[in-house]
Each structure stands twice: as structure tokens, then as C-alpha cells.
């Protein structure tokens, strides 16, 4: 077991430099760790599983996977389940949290493995390696990148210089080698098709000084062909999609669909891969590593050569020999290779045969090749070019990362593609699985055997457990005597080298000698090997040809004759025509590199990461139990746990055991402090004894304490948690009282702050309004009310209400514009032959412009449209008078329409909004006159006149504004009034006959007013107002029976009280029926078509005061029709004590604009009562409506308005066919017929057409909202 880091240690490097650390004092336990540490799902270390079965392992991994915990330990082995998504667990904060921490202190993570490897290197002065294994798509490459990320972050202490350069180059190898060595397969979008062993070299200070990469098993056959729905190496798609115009011109590049090698499989794009951006990342990695521009051009020239070689197509001639269908393609390929085109065609079509007699050189013949042979030679050349190019890139990277100073230690990271089982398994799968068998052998020897050796070393009594040793499978593949599979392949290749089919048959015959091996089965033209991961059936066809791995001498002569020096660098070996030595086969190379890898790994201290793929669909939520059980079996996880649990499930050094559990013994702890004075071993024994653990459940080793069953450890952890709860209960009694008092005080403070915070924003805006006016303008009394708030969007444009949506669409306001202010206004409109007149408008201000929207009746239909749009940048100044009127002029740049003059009751708020949006870069002119542009070249002046006879809003006539006196210009707003105290509700009595009204309170007349004021409209969510129906006459006897209390035995029932006298007859009431739906604003009454309301007052300006459900409000008179009342019936019997309320009808649920609870928020045309009922402006009720505002009546005529027809919905535009991609100009080279990818076009999503602006059907909109409200109520 690795030595644990000491608590309080600041860094691994410091500990390494200081030599052996002294025994450290046990730190005081921290009670808060149980509250701050996240509770893990399942068990984080599977050695603590109660049941050791594959199913139990799978259940634990599944629970943790579903809880987004993908890492689990088996002792020091990390199990990683690929999450197929970003869990946010690789950030710098997470990385730093593992820095300098022991494995047991933190939850399982790949950073913990990296920290352990780096720490052991610096403290034990030994080389380390991290072996990552698992099947394709299980996350090995990602784990390797995270290991390098951690080591690069924690190693070294100096910034800049060579150390940082080495770190950058090490990290830059990831995108570079992924581009050239990874490809999309059926199981993985970024599958490593080669093995990579990265060795990071460190100096004595623990700082990286260099690195070296060793490449294994590049799958070069993928260059010339792939199965369906797979791709070639990423670099080909990056190159063809992301190359610059200069590259395309130099190399004759087209899209990936133009090349047979990379388009034949029908997969050109991958959703999870952006080839263009990845190509830019590859170029940056080349620059970081130090590749010159000439070297980069040479690399891309070889890639282009491979692509054009694949487009050389062979056809069968009349004589049965192969011929090139388009010599122009061969000419361009020869141009890229810098060889003679005729020589290239000859090498591809002819083969040189040489006869020998008795060791003497004989005759030389040129033998024509058929189509299959020519294609094989072309593919062999392409594969050799790519393989040697990849080897050159690796060697070039090693040159750049070569250490400049001596290195002392190494941390190796092995990332090699995992065990593979396909439907058709060939030589590539045999090689891959062989290497994985070797890695499994290392795991068995170094992990399972080391586990048993630890028990022996610690002198622990235990029973050994047998485990599967896969060395017999490795011998089956690699042994020479008796001949293994590789040796048999070599013999078959040597005896029938001229005919691949004959060589395959020879191998089948020779492999029959392997049938005696229990792990081998011959099955005709196939054979089966029983690997540790499962049985794999291999196909013999083509296996001997792949094992040859040599180019014919004709192709080597062709390359030797090239004028490209880079090509000579890729093929440094000269052709020896006299050599009779058999070149090494692919099997020989694989066996040699695998044994060298094993030798390197055996010289290091290993760390293991076993990766698991949860499903085959790369889904972040799917968990395939069957597939994972198979991986658990062949990874040997159960055997690993059994060996770890053979004697004892948990072990820890004495110091760590004491640090964790010393609280459980009164002899070792007092008040949380460690008080034991003896040695650590005796301290552990005392803790376990006082915890009442049986002696057979634990043993003491030489340096560690061992616990047999995981239940014992769980018990100790539970007792440790219970200790803190017991101690906490003693403190809680005294603490609760303090906390209660503190909480009550905090609640009071919070309540006060919340109340102030809500009004603070509006008070700041209001104060800014005072600054804008600067004491120059008389103020309206209602503008100075303390409850006056600058709400802004009074028409609810941004709130999504029906009216807001209608106005937004009519004004054509884009969704990107933010509405800051909206209100009703009256625009001064000049008409031919008549004086100017105020006309109602909707005023909207966004962050870009000011909008004036008008509603008009045209052909019996209400039409709302945009009248004028004024960009904020065109407003030069704002002009107002110095009296209390509401007139405002926007002085804009010269235009035909001139400057708009309008009135707005929220003028101060409107000006503050405009100044805020424009940054205050405009002047506000306040004076006795308003100077404005009536037209483009025509100026005009509006004068003011103070007239005390004008009681309501200002009047306008002949360029003169008449208005009464207002509050002094230097007036300030009143403070916010305190909230009313809550009224305690009286207890209900059984004899109460007063009906309960859950609606708004009844209106009460203000001082000086003759009529009660209408209550302000409720803001926030729309509510359904209950409707109270007239009580139905019920016989008195029935009433008494219904309300009689239950009888009490032995007591006579008291007679019921006499009914109250009937109320005196009042004046006759007039009821009217609503003809249309109407949604009103503040002080107005909502109407639903068909309902009846009582008319309380009729005004000449077209608005009537109506009563509905005990509430009053204004409604348009031409929306109502009188209901003829029947003759009054005879007086009914006494009414019951409680009226019966009928079910309320559906009310409109259209949300209204936020209401303001003071007079300044009420438009002038709503304040009728103040102008007609009292001579003082101070007594004007907030919801009254002046008689001088007849122009604000929405229906302009008294006649019954016709119901507009619903406008037709514009037809949905037809979805056109997807246009064919534009094909660039054909390069000046001919192209051979190519294999096009499979058609996989999908119709794109078509956005729904936007709503047509302009006229909207208000009646239909209100009816639709009323129906929706009815559905919600039902």
C-alpha cells in the first residue's frame, strides 16, 4: 500500500525535498466534516460490499452512475464509467481540491490517481505509470487527458521558461495525435486507433523537463477502407473541410465527398465533432510543438497524395489486365509525389519478377497485374505513406519535447484502444486483443499477486484464493516453440508469399496443430480464442497478407526516385536488391513492441484505471446491465475484490486508523482532543476493544490494522457520527434560546429591509425626476403623493398580456427590444381647416425608439397600427412648460412630420426613462413657451396662460395652453406612507345574516365628493370576481328548520327569533346588457358579452358608471343595451339570513397593466368626478373622469358598433426543396468516378411565420381570453 501523506502537508514537492518526515501529532477531529461532505450513493470502495458478486458490483456502479458519480474504487484501482456528458468535475476548483490530499480524504476521482502517482514519485523516488484499460468508447483517452491535465497543473513551481513550454507541448500532443490517430467507429466518435505511451520526465525538483511518446499498433488499414457508418482518421475530414484557399489551390483539394478513401463508408459528418474548428486546433498544436511551415506543408502534401491515390480507379482491359480509367488522376498524384507519371502507372500496373537458379540471379520479367492486384498495390502505397507519416510526426514531437536537462523520474500514461469483439474480426483485432492480454497479465501479476504478498509482509493469517492467470493465452499467441499463432502466420506467409489465398489455406492447415490448446478452437476458415474478455472468432481470409506488412521493391524504387526530400525522410531505408533476409512481419513488430511496453511498465510503480462503457448508444442516461456485467466479468473486478477481501476488507496504517476513530475510546480522546500517550499500535487495539469489536474481526499487522468485514467498518463510522450527535445535544439546549432570539431580531431587520428595498428603486427614479425638473416646473398634487411609483410599463407590453401583445405587434417591436415605458397619451393632431386637437394614442418607449400607436375604427373594425416611430438618437431635446400641465414636445432632427406634441400624465417618469436610455445626452427645456417644429421648415410656439377657472387638466386652443395653478416648482414628493395595521377579523356568529363578499371593498365617497370613488384596480394576476345573485324567497318555516340547532336531551328548544323587517323600497334600478366583451383599465369595468349590469350614473361623454358584483367602474355606453324590466312583483317574504351565491360566470383572464395607487397614475379622461362635483382640485378622486375628455372615448360613435370579422390567418409559406450545395470550381486536374456517400438528407426545421402586423381583431382576442378563463375555472 502506498504511504499516506501527512496531514497539514502543503505540497508534495516540499515533502520530497525535506526528506523523511517525522511522525506527526494526531490532529483534532473536525465535527463539521459530516455536514460539508456530500453523501455518496452506494459504496465508494467496492471492497466494502457486503456481497461479492458480479450483480452486486453492477448494482453499486448503477446507483452511482445514476447519481452522477462515475468513479469508484477497488482499493487502489479506479473504476470509471463513461458518462457521455460533461459533469463539470474537471474544473480548476475541483483539481485544486485534490492537490496534496490522500486518496481516502476525497471522493474517488481520476485526479486522485494522478495525485497519488505524482506524490509517490516525489516521495519514494520511483518511476510511476498509469495503465488505462477498457473497451473502445469507455473513456480511456479522456482519462489520459485528465491525468496529463492534473500533472501539468501541479508539477513545478516556476512560471514561464522551459517548464511551462514543456507543459504546453505535453498538452498540445492531445489534439495533434487525436487528429492523426483517432477515428469515428460504430461504438465511439473519437476512438483511438493506435496505442500511445506518454512518458513525462521530471527533474529532482519534481518539475517536468521533457517527454517522450511511443506509438503502438496504428490501424493503417483504416486509411484505405472502413465499414459502413465509420470514418477514416479525423485529419482527412479536417483537412478537406478546413483547409485554406491556398492549400486547396496547391493540392487540388475538394470536399470530403470527392475522395473514395474517405467517402465510401457514407459517413462524412459527426454531430459531436466540428472538423473545421478541430483543424484550427490541430494547426495551433503544430505551432506549439514547433513544426515549421515547410514541415506542415510537407505533411499536408502527403495527405493530399493519399487522397488522390485513392481516386485512381482500375478497369479490366481486353486482355484481362488492369488499366487506369483516368490517367489524369495518376498524373496529379505523381505531381504530388514528385515522380514521373509513367513510372507511377507502370509500378501500379506491372510487377517485376526475378528468377533465380542455384543462388545466381536469373532473368527479370514484367508481369501485368489484374484489377485486384493493382488495387492492392495502390492501397499498400497509401497505407505505407500514412503509417510512416504518423511515425515521423511522433518522432518529431519527441525531438521537440526532448529534455534539455537530465531527468531522474518518469510518470508514464498508457492510452491504448481496448478489447474489441466485432462480427468480422481479423488481424487488427487479433493484434489489439493480444496487447490487452499482455496488459491484463501485468494487472494480475502486479495487483492481485501484490495483494497477497501484502498479507505475507504484514504477517496476517489468511486463506489464498485462486484466480485466472491469462499467461496461457499470451503464450498461445506469441510463443515460437511450440509455434503460436504469430509464428504460424509467419510460416504460412513465407511458404506461399505469392498467392494470398494459398497463404491463408496454409495457415488453416498449420493451425490445426494448435487444437490441443484448450483456449484455441479451429472452425474451418475461422478460429476461436478464449480471451480473458470473452471468446472471439477470427476470420482467416486476408490475415496472412496483412501480416506481411512489406512494400514490393518496385514501389520502394519509385519512392527512392522521388525529388521530394521529405518523402525520403519517411522512407529512410534503401532498397537492397541482393538481400535474401525475410523482412519482419507485422506480427513480429507487434510482439516486439508489446514486450518492450511490458518491460517499461514492469519497471514502474503501476496505477490502474479500468474504464467501463455503460451503453452502445453513447446515451448519458442509459445503463445497459447486460453489457456492463460482461465488462465486469472480463475486467476481473470480482476476482480483484475477492483477493482484496480474502482476509480483510479494510486496512489502514496505525496513524490513519487512530486519526479516524480515536473519538470512540475514552482512553484516547477527551472533548475531541487526542490524549493517548502510548504507541500507535496499542492505541488502535484499545480503540477496537473499547468499541466492543470481536477479536476475530480484526488483526494488527506490522504497520497496518486490518478489519475483516465491511459491516464492522460501517459500525465504526456510525459510532463516530453518533459521537458528534451526542455531544451536539448538550450544546443545543443552550444554543436554541440564543438562536431563537437572534432569528427574531434578524427577521425584524429583514422585514424592514424588504419593505425599504422594494420602494428604494422607485424612490431613486422619483428623485431623479426632481433633478431633471430642477425646480422649474409647477407640480401636480398627485405627482407628489408618497405612494407614487415609477412603474414604467403601464400597458404591460413586456408582460405578455393580450393588449400588450397586440400593441407590440402593431408597433412592430422586435423581441430584441426591451420596453422601458408605456402609457396612454394624447397627441396634438392638426387637421386641414380646423384647429389642432388632442387625440388618444398609445406611447411606447424602448431602448431604441419612441413609438406612437393609434387605434381607429375603419369599416366597422378596430384597427391598431403604428403611427410614428422616433429613434432615440434623433431626439435633440425635450421641451415642456413651467406650469402644471402635461404637455411635452420631443425636438427631433429635421423631418417632414415635425416635432410631436402630446400630453402624458407620467411625463416626469417618461423624461427620466429617455434620459436614462440616452445617457443624459440631451437638454430638457422648461419655460413659459414651447418652441417646436410644426413641419420640416416651419417653426411654431405654444404659449401658456394661467387660468384658475380651469379645474381639471389643461385646455388647449389656438396655440395656447390654459391651466390652473399647481404646487410650487421646488416641491418634493411626500414620504412613503406607512402601511395600514392589519385588522383583526371578528369572530363569526351563527346569527349573522350579513353576506360575506370576497371581492373588492365597497367604494366610499371622498371628502368633498358627491359620489363614491371607484376602488383602484388590482394589479398582479387576474382574478375572477364573484357574482352575488339575488336571494330566492324561502318559506320562513323552512328557514327555521334549516337553521335550527341540534336538540339537547332534557332541555326545551327555544323558539326561533322573529325575522327582520323588509328593507324600505329604493328607487328603481336600470339594468343593461353587455353587447360585446370589454377589457378596461384602472377605474373601468370589465364586461363580458351577455351579462347584465346596473347603470348608476350616465355621463354625456359616452361613459357610464356601472355596478357589477358590488363594485363600480366606468364602461362605454355604446357597449350596453337596456333590459326592459318586468313590473315589480309583490313584496317577497322575509329574506334568509345568508344570501345564496350563484356560480360566477367566466370573467376575462387577460392580465392588465400594473396599477398605481395614486392620482397621478390616472389619465385625465378618467377623472370625471373631480371636475364636476367639487370646486377644489385637492379633492379630486383618483378614479374620477372629467367631462372635458370626450375625445378619449374608445368607440367614437354612439351607435352600436359592428362586430369585426376575424382576419384571415396568412397561409403558411411552402417549404422549398433544400438547395444543392454550391460546388466550387473544379481544380485543373481530372477526377475519376468516385463512390458517393449514402444519401442522408433531412428536411430542415422551418420557423413558423411571424404574425402579420397591422390590424388585429380585438373582439376575437377578448373572446378567446374569456373562453380560456372559463376553461381554467372549470
From Swiss-Prot:
SMART domains: MYSc (SM00242), SH3 (SM00326). ATP binds at residues 134-141. Residues 1054-1067, 1126-1138 have a biased composition (Pro residues). Residues 410-492 are annotated as: Actin-binding. Residues 957-974 have a biased composition (Polar residues). Residues 41-721 form the Myosin motor domain. InterPro entries: Kinesin_motor_dom_sf, Myosin_head_motor_dom-like, Myosin_TH1, MYSc_Myo1, P-loop_NTPase, SH3-like_dom_sf, SH3_domain. Residues 779-969 form the TH1 domain. GO terms for molecular function: actin filament binding; Arp2/3 complex binding; ATP binding; hydrolase activity; microfilament motor activity. Keywords: Actin-binding, ATP-binding, Cytoplasm, Cytoskeleton, Hydrolase, Motor protein, Myosin, Nucleotide-binding, Phosphoprotein, Repeat, SH3 domain. It holds the Pfam family Myosin_head. The modification Phosphoserine is found at residue 363. Phosphorylation of the TEDS site (Ser-363) is required for the polarization of the actin cytoskeleton. Phosphorylation probably activates the myosin-I ATPase activity. Its main location: cytoplasm. Residues 1-28, 951-1029, 1042-1071, 1116-1248 are annotated as: Disordered. Type-I myosin implicated in the organization of the actin cytoskeleton. Required for proper actin cytoskeleton polarization. At the cell cortex, assembles in patch-like structures together with proteins from the actin-polymerizing machinery and promotes actin assembly. Functions as actin nucleation-promoting factor (NPF) for the Arp2/3 complex. Belongs to the TRAFAC class myosin-kinesin ATPase superfamily. Myosin family. The myosin motor domain displays actin-stimulated ATPase activity and generates a mechanochemical force. The tail domain participates in molecular interactions that specify the role of the motor domain. It is composed of several tail homology (TH) domains, namely a putative phospholipid-binding myosin tail domain (also named TH1), an Ala- and Pro-rich domain (TH2), followed by an SH3 domain and a C-terminal acidic domain (TH3). This is Myosin-1. It comes from Cryptococcus neoformans var. neoformans serotype D (strain JEC21 / ATCC MYA-565) (Filobasidiella neoformans).
Amino acid at each position: 500500500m502506498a504511504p499516506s501523506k501527512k496531514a497539514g502537508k502543503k505540497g508534495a514537492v516540499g515533502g520530497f525535498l525535506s526528506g523523511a518526515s517525522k511522525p506527526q501529532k494526531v490532529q483534532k477531529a473536525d465535527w463539521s466534516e459530516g455536514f460539508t461532505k456530500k453523501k455518496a450513493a452506494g459504496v465508494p470502495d467496492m471492497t466494502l460490499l457486503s456481497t461479492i458478486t458480479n450483480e452486486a458490483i453492477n448494482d453499486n456502479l448503477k446507483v452511482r452512475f445514476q447519481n452522477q458519480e462515475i468513479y469508484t474504487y477497488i482499493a487502489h484501482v479506479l473504476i470509471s464509467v463513461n458518462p457521455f456528458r460533461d459533469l463539470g468535475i474537471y474544473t480548476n476548483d475541483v483539481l485544486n481540491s485534490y492537490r496534496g490530499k490522500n486518496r481516502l480524504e476525497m471522493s474517488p476521482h481520476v485526479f486522485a490517481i494522478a495525485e497519488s502517482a505524482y506524490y509517490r514519485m516525489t516521495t519514494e523516488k520511483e518511476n510511476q505509470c498509469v495503465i488505462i484499460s477498457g473497451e473502445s468508447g469507455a473513456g480511456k483517452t479522456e482519462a489520459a487527458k485528465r491525468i496529463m491535465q492534473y500533472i501539468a497543473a501541479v508539477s513545478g513551481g516556476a512560471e514561464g521558461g522551459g517548464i511551462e513550454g514543456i507543459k504546453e507541448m505535453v498538452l498540445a500532443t492531445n489534439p495533434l495525435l487525436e487528429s492523426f490517430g483517432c477515428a469515428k467507429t460504430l461504438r465511439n466518435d473519437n476512438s483511438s486507433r493506435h496505442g500511445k505511451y506518454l512518458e513525462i520526465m521530471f527533474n529532482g525538483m519534481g518539475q517536468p523537463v521533457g517527454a517522450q511518446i511511443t506509438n503502438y499498433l496504428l490501424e493503417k488499414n483504416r486509411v484505405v477502407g472502413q465499414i459502413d457508418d465509420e470514418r477514416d482518421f479525423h485529419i482527412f475530414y479536417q483537412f478537406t473541410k478546413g483547409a485554406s484557399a491556398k492549400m486547396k489551390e496547391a493540392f487540388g483539394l475538394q470536399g470530403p465527398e470527392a475522395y473514395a478513401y474517405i467517402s465510401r463508408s457514407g459517413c462524412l459528418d459527426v454531430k459531436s465533432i466540428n472538423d473545421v474548428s478541430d483543424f484550427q486546433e490541430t494547426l495551433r498544436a503544430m505551432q506549439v510543438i514547433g513544426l515549421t511551415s515547410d514541415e506542415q506543408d510537407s505533411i499536408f502534401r502527403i495527405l493530399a497524395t493519399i487522397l488522390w491515390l485513392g481516386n485512381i480507379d482500375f478497369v479490366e482491359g481486353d486482355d484481362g489486365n488492369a488499366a487506369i480509367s483516368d490517367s489524369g488522376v495518376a498524373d496529379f498524384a505523381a505531381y504530388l509525389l514528385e515522380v514521373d507519371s509513367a513510372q507511377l502507372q507502370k509500378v501500379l500496373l506491372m510487377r517485376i519478377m526475378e528468377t533465380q537458379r542455384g543462388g545466381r540471379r536469373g532473368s527479370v520479367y514484367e508481369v501485368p497485374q489484374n484489377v485486384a492486384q493493382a488495387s492492392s498495390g495502390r492501397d499498400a502505397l497509401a497505407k505505407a505513406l500514412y503509417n510512416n507519416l504518423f511515425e515521423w510526426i511522433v518522432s518529431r514531437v519527441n525531438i521537440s519535447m526532448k529534455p534539455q536537462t537530465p531527468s531522474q523520474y518518469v510518470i508514464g500514461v498508457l492510452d491504448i484502444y481496448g478489447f474489441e469483439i466485432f462480427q468480422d474480426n481479423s488481424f487488427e483485432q487479433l493484434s489489439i486483443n493480444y496487447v490487452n492480454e499482455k496488459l491484463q497479465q501485468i494487472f494480475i501479476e502486479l495487483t492481485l499477486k501484490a495483494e497477497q504478498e501484502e498479507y505475507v509482509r504484514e504477517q496476517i493469517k489468511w486463506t489464498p484464493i485462486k484466480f485466472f492467470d491469462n499467461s496461457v493465452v499470451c503464450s498461445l499467441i506469441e510463443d515460437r516453440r511450440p509455434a503460436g499463432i504469430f509464428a504460424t502466420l509467419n510460416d504460412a506467409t513465407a511458404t506461399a508469399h505469392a498467392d494470398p489465398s494459398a497463404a491463408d489455406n496454409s495457415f488453416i492447415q498449420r493451425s490445426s496443430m494448435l487444437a490441443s490448446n484448450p483456449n484455441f478452437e479451429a472452425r474451418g476458415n475461422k478460429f476461436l480464442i478464449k480471451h480473458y474478455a470473452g471468446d472471439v472468432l477470427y476470420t482467416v481470409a486476408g490475415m496472412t497478407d496483412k501480416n506481411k506488412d512489406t512494400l514490393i521493391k518496385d514501389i520502394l524504387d519509385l519512392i527512392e526516385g522521388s525529388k521530394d526530400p521529405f518523402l525520403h525522410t519517411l522512407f529512410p531505408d534503401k532498397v537492397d536488391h541482393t538481400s535474401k533476409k525475410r523482412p519482419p512481419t507485422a506480427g513480429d513488430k507487434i510482439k516486439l513492441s508489446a514486450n518492450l511496453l511490458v518491460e517499461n511498465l514492469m519497471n514502474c510503480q503501476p496505477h490502474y484505471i479500468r474504464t467501463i462503457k455503460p451503453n452502445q448508444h453513447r446515451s448519458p442516461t442509459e445503463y445497459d446491465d447486460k453489457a456492463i456485467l460482461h465488462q465486469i466479468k472480463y475486467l476481473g473486478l470480482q476476482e480483484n475484490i475477492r483477493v482484496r477481501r480474502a482476509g480483510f476488507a479494510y486496512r489502514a496504517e496505525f496513524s490513519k486508523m487512530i486519526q479516524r476513530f480515536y473519538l470512540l475510546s475514552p482512553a484516547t480522546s477527551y472533548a475531541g482532543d487526542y490524549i493517548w500517550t502510548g504507541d500507535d499500535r496499542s492505541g488502535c487495539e484499545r480503540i477496537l476493544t473499547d468499541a466492543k469489536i470481536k477479536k476475530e474481526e480484526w488483526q494488527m499487522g506490522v504497520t497496518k490494522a486490518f478489519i475483516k468485514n465491511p459491516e464492522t467498518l460501517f459500525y465504526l463510522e456510525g459510532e463516530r457520527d453518533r459521537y458528534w450527535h451526542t455531544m451536539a445535544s448538550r450544546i443545543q439546549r443552550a444554543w436554541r434560546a440564543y438562536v431563537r432570539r437572534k432569528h427574531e431580531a434578524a427577521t425584524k431587520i429583514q422585514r424592514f429591509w424588504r419593505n425599504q428595498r422594494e420602494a428604494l428603486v422607485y424612490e431613486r427614479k422619483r428623485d431623479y425626476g426632481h433633478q431633471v425638473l430642477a425646480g422649474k416646473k409647477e407640480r401636480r398634487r398627485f405627482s407628489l403623493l408618497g405612494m407614487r411609483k415609477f412603474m414604467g410599463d403601464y400597458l404591460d407590453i413586456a408582460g405578455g398580456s393580450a393588449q400588450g401583445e397586440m400593441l407590440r405587434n402593431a408597433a412592430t417591436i422586435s423581441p430584441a427590444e426591451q420596453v422601458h415605458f408605456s402609457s396612454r397619451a394624447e397627441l396634438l393632431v392638426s387637421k386641414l381647416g380646423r384647429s389642432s386637437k388632442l387625440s388618444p394614442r398609445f406611447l411606447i418607449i424602448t431602448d431604441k425608439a419612441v413609438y406612437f400607436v393609434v387605434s381607429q375604427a375603419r369599416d366597422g373594425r378596430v384597427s391598431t397600427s403604428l403611427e410614428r416611430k422616433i429613434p432615440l438618437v434623433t431626439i435633440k431635446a425635450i421641451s415642456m412648460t413651467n406650469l402644471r400641465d402635461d404637455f411635452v414636445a420631443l425636438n427631433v432632427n429635421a423631418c417632414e412630420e415635425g416635432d410631436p406634441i402630446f400630453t402624458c400624465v407620467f411625463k416626469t417618469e417618461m423624461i427620466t426613462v429617455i434620459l436614462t436610455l440616452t445617457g443624459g445626452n440631451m437638454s430638457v427645456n422648461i419655460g413659459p413657451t414651447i418652441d417646436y417644429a410644426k413641419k420640416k421648415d416651419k417653426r411654431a410656439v405654444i404659449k401658456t396662460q394661467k387660468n384658475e377657472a380651469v379645474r381639471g387638466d389643461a385646455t388647449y386652443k389656438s396655440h395656447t395652453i390654459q391651466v390652473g395653478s399647481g404646487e410650487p416648482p421646488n416641491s418634493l414628493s411626500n414620504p412613503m406612507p406607512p402601511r395600514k395595521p392589519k385588522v383583526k377579523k371578528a369572530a363569526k356568529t351563527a346569527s349573522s345574516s350579513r353576506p360575506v363578499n370576497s371581492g373588492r371593498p365597497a367604494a366610499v365617497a371622498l371628502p368633498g365628493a358627491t359620489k363614491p370613488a371607484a376602488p383602484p384596480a388590482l394589479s398582479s394576476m387576474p382574478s375572477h370576481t364573484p357574482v352575488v345573485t339575488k336571494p330566492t324567497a324561502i318559506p320562513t318555516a323552512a328557514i327555521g328548520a334549516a337553521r335550527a340547532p341540534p336538540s339537547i336531551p332534557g332541555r326545551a328548544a327555544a323558539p326561533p327569533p322573529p325575522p327582520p323587517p323588509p328593507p324600505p323600497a329604493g328607487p328603481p334600478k336600470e339594468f343593461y346588457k353587455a353587447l360585446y366583451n370589454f377589457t378596461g383599465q384602472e377605474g373601468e369595468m370589465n364586461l363580458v358579452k351577455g351579462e347584465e349590469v346596473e347603470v348608476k350614473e350616465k355621463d354625456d361623454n359616452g361613459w357610464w358608471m356601472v355596478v357589477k358584483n358590488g363594485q363600480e367602474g366606468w364602461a362605454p355606453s355604446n357597449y350596453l343595451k337596456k333590459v326592459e324590466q318586468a313590473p315589480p312583483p309583490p313584496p317577497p317574504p322575509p329574506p334568509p339570513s345568508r344570501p345564496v351565491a350563484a356560480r360566477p360566470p367566466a370573467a376575462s383572464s387577460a392580465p392588465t397593466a400594473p396599477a398605481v395607487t395614486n392620482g397621478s397614475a390616472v389619465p385625465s379622461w378618467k377623472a370625471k368626478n373631480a371636475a364636476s362635483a367639487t370646486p377644489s382640485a385637492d379633492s379630486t378622486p383618483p378614479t374620477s373622469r372629467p367631462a372635458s375628455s370626450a375625445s378619449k372615448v374608445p368607440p367614437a360613435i354612439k351607435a352600436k358598433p359592428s362586430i369585426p370579422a376575424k382576419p384571415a390567418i396568412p397561409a403558411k409559406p411552402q417549404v422549398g426543396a433544400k438547395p444543392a450545395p454550391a460546388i466550387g470550381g473544379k481544380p485543373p486536374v481530372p477526377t475519376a468516378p468516385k463512390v458517393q456517400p449514402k444519401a442522408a438528407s433531412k428536411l430542415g426545421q422551418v420557423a413558423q411565420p411571424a404574425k402579420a402586423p397591422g390590424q388585429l381583431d380585438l373582439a376575437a382576442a377578448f373572446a378567446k381570453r374569456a373562453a380560456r378563463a372559463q376553461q381554467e375555472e372549470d
